[in-house]
Amino acid sequence: MSDSVILRSVKKFGEENHAFESDGFHNNDKKSRLQDKKKGEGARVGFFELFRFSSSKDNWLMFMGSVCALLHGMAQPGMIIVFGILTDIFVEYDIERQELSIPEKVCMNNTIVWINSSFNQNMTNGTSCGLVDINSEVIKFSGIYAGVGVAVLILGYFQIRLWVITGARQIRKMRKFYFRRIMRMEIGWFDCTSVGELNSRFSDDINKIDEAIADQMALFLQRLSTALSGLLLGFYRGWKLTLVILAVSPLIGIGAAVIGLSVAKFTELELKAYAKAGSIADEVLSSIRTVAAFGGENKEVERYEKNLMFAQRWGIWKGMVMGFFTGYMWCLIFFCYALAFWYGSRLVLDEGEYTPGTLIQIFLCVIIAAMNIGNASSCLEIFSTGCSAASSIFQTIDRQPVMDCMSGDGYKLDRIKGEIEFHNVTFHYPSRPEVKILNNLSMVIKPGETTAFVGSSGAGKSTALQLIQRFYDPCEGMVTLDGHDIRSLNIRWLRDQIGIVEQEPVLFSTTIAENIRLGREEATMEDIVQAAKDANAYNFIMALPQQFDTLVGEGGGQMSGGQKQRVAIARALIRKPKILLLDMATSALDNESEAKVQGALNKIQHGHTIISVAHRLSTVRSADVIIGFEHGTAVERGTHEELLERKGVYFMLVTLQSQEDNTHKETGIKGKDTTEGDTPERTFSRGSYQDSLRASIRQRSKSQLSHLSHEPPLAIGDHKSSYEDRKDNDVLVEEVEPAPVRRILKYNISEWPYILVGALCAAINGAVTPIYSLLFSQILKTFSLVDKEQQRSEIYSMCLFFVILGCVSLFTQFLQGYNFAKSGELLTKRLRKFGFKAMLRQDIGWFDDLKNNPGVLTTRLATDASQVQGATGSQVGMMVNSFTNIFVAVLIAFLFNWKLSLVISVFFPFLALSGAVQTKMLTGFASQDKEILEKAGQITNEALSNIRTVAGIGVEGRFIKAFEVELEKSYKTAIRKANVYGLCYAFSQGISFLANSAAYRYGGYLIVYEDLNFSYVFRVVSSIAMSATAVGRTFSYTPSYAKAKISAARFFQLLDRKPPIDVYSGAGEKWDNFQGKIDFIDCKFTYPSRPDIQVLNGLSVSVDPGQTLAFVGSSGCGKSTSIQLLERFYDPDQGTVMIDGHDSKKVNVQFLRSNIGIVSQEPVLFDCSIMDNIKYGDNTKEISVERAIAAAKQAQLHDFVMSLPEKYETNVGIQGSQLSRGEKQRIAIARAIVRDPKILLLDEATSALDTESEKTVQLALDKAREGRTCIVIAHRLSTIQNSDIIAVMSQGVVIEKGTHKKLMDQKGAYYKLVITGAPIS
């Protein structure tokens, strides 16, 4: 066959289609996307844009809710007009009473006359009298108060209910749109976006938008209505005084604008810091086995805390700014009081323009307006936070994906042959534009042929597969299918024609049957069974208790690697694809399974185009065409024989392979052709599905270190069967009793100086309002004085007091804001840190629990810690403020008239009852809502973590459907919450009007019959009214208080849990001369999440110090489980693991793990530099750069690292996604070498490497094994033949053991496995 590649002419079919773009434009488009991302980060969202998801029904609900809020807001200014009229009546009555108290004066003909004066004198100087019937006037006004109270009850209920409902509807829609848009994004977008950050946006950011568009809008409109109607009434009753009071309003407006911008900026910075911290938490919790194995718990807590520090700093700044603004507002308001009474008294006394009642009406209307503008400003902070949170959400929603997998655009071919051509394709990943992966690649893949790609790690083999699936588009050149540029084809249709089986298969948290059905939605049960048989999975599935209904756990964590692989192959086969892509598809299988699966794959070859990347020798040798890759280019093409003659890349790989096989043959296998499929297994090269890209962002590495996580089932298939049925049980487990506030505050105890100063300032601020009511009533009393000079003198004194109050408020409000922000942010940081630390403290079995998958835990860290501030921080300040307000107000009231105070106090129990009901009900709703959103979080986390698999098999729609089912439940909870919250709020608002009605009725009686001064009635009523407002305000904190207690309870539940294997505990045995002798004595074990399946069934095997023990056996026989017992991820149910004669259960966990190093098949790396990843091998001390480089050299890594632009400072990406598998594996080996362990565990340690690298790394491992006890797990028997002991396992027990020679001579299970690949039984 010719070496040259013949390229056919391309039909540029559908050039008018937007999917078909010129190369230059396409490349520019990618660059512009990255620029857009940078520009978009600072983009602001306008407030009204928050309501972009409202439907016509929502508009109607918002309109009606707004009408109710606006009418409710008018109630208070309206009653001020009534109050002014009442004031004039009381003043007139008091003047009459004072005049008639003079013995020489009497009331005759409605005029006060001197008994001894002439008629003319009396007519000139007389004051009218007897015209006021106080009793009947008071009854009339009491009736008006009662009527308004009832109206407020109705309006208050509907304003809250309607706004909460419309908020819930819009947030539900927003979550749907956001998730749908994310699921439509091209893979390149995920390369540059962290899953942890996206999960944080789903929970934290959307919750902040929810707060901004629900009940807060109702409260804002109510306060705005009060402010506007107050101003209008002020102008109507007296424009002069109104203008004087408003003279300071520009100062308020300027202050509000400056503060609003500052708060928005600080909020944005705070959210970014929290998103970064969330990303770290997600990465760590997803790789918990690796963290535990290398003792990285404390290092990870420090890394997490570092990002929390930034968030804390911005939170404190935000609190300071808000505190200053509140003080600034109060200061201006009190200065207004002083100015108003000074100027107003002149208009009343000197010019006679106003009556005292008119002055009070104007003053109170304008001041109520100003106060409500101040109160409304607290809503502005929430709106501003909502807008900041929305910017990244809306930016994602508005972003048009470059490749929309759910779009109907593009052509669908009637029939396809399956001919694929690469035309001068050049490509780099969006996340690493400086590294060229494919360089002018040209090749033809003929239909119906099996084509094998071979080449060293990082040569671009797997990248070529990703371009065929259109996960990316070439930067230059084109890929064609049957002569059509694949950019002109419909993406969903294209991927439906392709089956993919990768080396690290991803299964989803549902049943085995549903996982297979994901390959083809309309597949019947017969199709599923047949696919399982074709993939050699049927027998092991039928051996499980629930057979095809067995739940596989998150990422297939409940199964061994081989079992996962076979289910993934069944999923690909059921698609009946025209093109089958095999990326190391049988690497995780033992010999017997591999041979059978390979046979199944060969059976379907006819009529299919098969592309196999770096398969075993038998597969590559029998391929119709072999294409050799080097540096991103196809350098040779031909059959096995042709390429051997050519003596190029392929020849070199085969030569290396043959040398190892010859070595193997000499040790006991004679006359057997090593090129047959059932011989010792070897791999040509490693091109993982994650080569040089961020695949692992979504691909949770489920290695032997990280794959046995038994996570909750999620409904991507049959939603009810795999998810709904478990709901009731979950709820029972999840319910928590709200935490006592005392304990929450205990965690804030180290900030007691801040809390004390803040509380003192809050107490002063709380006392200011009742003192104001005292001064106010005193001014009213002044107007009834007969001597005008005395009136002036007293009014000026009151004005001076107001100025002093303003100055005090400025100072105390600022200190309150700062101190509580400081204490609250420190508490949030502490709780997040403690929560994260407590999570890392838990045993691995805890992470297997369906409630504790990474998505749920990350969501919990993000929301719970910040919600605990609802019972601490600034909320404490507001509570202290309110309670002081109530105490001082009640004290003043009882001092001046205890009878009237008692009558009004009758209404307090009703307020308290309303608050208690509100707290109780909302606590319940908060608990339900949190649980539902956590379940939704599990769905998003699983989908986004495995986005390549989701896109490859086209199940985006299933995840979207499952997610939306959970959202419906959350919506129903919100509807119930709306009714309770609305009723309680309405009651707390309306009761004050009813209390006023009763107070004025009884006050009128006391004035007439007990000669009480009218100013005392005002003093008592306004004091109690102030305290009632404070009570109402206290209960407005109950929703966040309720959430806080639930969130805190979850934290305490976590902090209180004492894990059976405690990594932080100092207890346990330690000894100096650690040898590394290991004895498994009759170990029996079942995983906590699957107690019905016995994994180890009496395992007994020993290895002396410095010896190598190799475990051999079929997939799922318990090999990896034994390693997990040795690492103390679990303890055996029965039997003992002995280390140097010590029972492992009694050995200190950190001490034990510090003497063990591990290299697993699918290594987990962290999102930091190569140097930091190597140093992660030993977290007990600072590793020198020299020592790390020495380890890298030993692992054959150094030369590769030095070829990178940033050398050892190169960031590996999340989960090592910027590197090929071979590169990742060598870093993992260097990490283990740096640890200098006494016991070395190698779990398929070289399986990820190409032949060239493997040989050198194997030598490095052999060297690393010297003087160490070593346990090796390998399917490839040639890697373990030199072991001191080979233990053959079957069904959780060792069935034979000995050296390679001894076992070959015995001709038992091991011999059969080596020679024939027969089952071990």
Curated annotation (Swiss-Prot):
UniProt family annotation: Belongs to the ABC transporter superfamily. ABCB family. Multidrug resistance exporter (TC 3.A.1.201) subfamily.
Occurrences of domain ABC transporter (ranges): 420-656, 1078-1316
Bias kind Basic and acidic residues: ranges: 662-684
Cysteine disulfide links: none
Organism classification: Eukaryota, Metazoa, Chordata, Craniata, Vertebrata
Record note on disruption phenotype: Transgenic mice with up-regulated liver canalicular membrane expression of Abcb11 appear healthy and normal and demonstrate any difference in longevity. Transgenic mice exhibit a normal reproductive rate and gender distribution and are born in a normal Mendelian distribution. Transgenic mice have food consumption identical to their background strain controls. Transgenic mice manifest increases of both bile flow and biliary lipid secretion and are resistant to the development of hepatic steatosis.
Residues exposed to the Cytoplasmic side: 1-62, 169-215, 262-319, 375-755, 816-869, 912-979, 1033-1321
Gene assigned in the entry: Abcb11
Pfam families registered for this protein in UniProt: ABC_membrane, ABC_tran
Transmembrane segments: 63-83, 148-168, 216-236, 241-261, 320-340, 354-374, 756-776, 795-815, 870-890, 891-911, 980-1000, 1012-1032
Record-given protein name: Bile salt export pump
UniProt domain comment: Multifunctional polypeptide with two homologous halves, each containing a hydrophobic membrane-anchoring domain and an ATP binding cassette (ABC) domain.
Tissue expr: Expressed predominantly, if not exclusively in the liver, where it was further localized to the canalicular microvilli and to subcanalicular vesicles of the hepatocytes by in situ.
Cellular component terms (Gene Ontology): apical part of cell; apical plasma membrane; cell surface; endosome; intercellular canaliculus; intracellular canaliculus; membrane; plasma membrane
Annotated segments matching region Interaction with HAX1: 651-674
Membrane topology qualifier: Multi-pass membrane protein
Catalytic reactions on record: cholate(in) + ATP + H2O = cholate(out) + ADP + phosphate + H(+); taurocholate(in) + ATP + H2O = taurocholate(out) + ADP + phosphate + H(+); glycocholate(in) + ATP + H2O = glycocholate(out) + ADP + phosphate + H(+); glycochenodeoxycholate(in) + ATP + H2O = glycochenodeoxycholate(out) + ADP + phosphate + H(+)
GO terms assigned for molecular function: ABC-type bile acid transporter activity; ABC-type xenobiotic transporter activity; ATP binding; ATP hydrolysis activity; bile acid transmembrane transporter activity; canalicular bile acid transmembrane transporter activity
Keywords of the record: ATP-binding, Cell membrane, Endosome, Glycoprotein, Lipid transport, Membrane, Nucleotide-binding, Phosphoprotein, Repeat, Translocase, Transmembrane, Transmembrane helix, Transport, Ubl conjugation
SUPFAM superfamilies the record matches: ABC transporter transmembrane region, P-loop containing nucleoside triphosphate hydrolases
